[in-house]
Amino acid sequence: MNTASFQLTDKITLGDGHEIDPGVILGYLTGRDIADVALSIGSGARIRSGTVIYAGSTIGLGLETGHNVVIREENTIGDHFNIWNNSTIDYGCTIGDNVKVHCNVYIAQFTTLEDDVFIAPGVMIVNDPHPICGFCMRGPTIKRGARIGVNVTLMSHITIGEGALIGAGSVVTHDIHPHSVAYGNPARPVKYVDELLCPFDLVDRPYVDGLDVKARQAGIRRRL
């Protein structure tokens, strides 16, 4: 028997072809006063046990979650969004199409992830330069196709440029130019992604050849 919990049933819209595990909560009511408590999830969703999706968000086609995922209210999320185990999207975020958020990630309020962004495990995204103050909260903007490595911390009010790559363990405190490779604490750009070579000789330049393949696959998914 499916023991998923649907709160505010009349305000939840689920597209066709969804698969929802027992132990999922949809339409969880926030304690905040929000304008619209409707929850809309597009067709083809795969929502695994332990996931909690709050009332008041819009999510596109092909959502897939791992276990123990939290997606809070007032989020606008595009098609084919993947988010894996123990990750949290706080409220007020904007997320594009074909975005992947890996395990144990925290994405703070008012963060923007554009299309085709990849967030590796353990990434922490923050939004407040003056903790507890609350007057100037704004998360980073991560531009289309940028990739954030394992255990990176992204500070508030910054922009990660289109196609940029942030190395594992970095702390990013300022804007990163498009297509740059940056790492360190604080992270600094060291080269461009099209200069990187594949150490295994699988492709010549992984962030040129490899991304071309990925883009074609994403285009096929959109047409389907």
Predicted regions and their residues:
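Membrane-proximal basic amphipathic "stem/tether" segments
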Residues: 1-3, 209
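Left-handed beta-helix
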Residues: 4, 10, 16, 21-22, ...
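Context-gated lysine
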Residues: 11, 100, 143, 191, ...
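Intrinsic-disorder/low-complexity loop/linker signature
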Residues: 17, 195-197, 210
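N-terminal glycine-rich cofactor-binding segment
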Residues: 32-34
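Short, low-complexity, polar/charged sequence segments that are solvent-exposed and flexible
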Residues: 43-45, 144-146, 200-203, 209-211
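Conserved beta-strand-loop-alpha-helix hinge in the C-terminal portion
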Residues: 178-203
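ABC ATPase nucleotide-binding domains
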Residues: 204-224
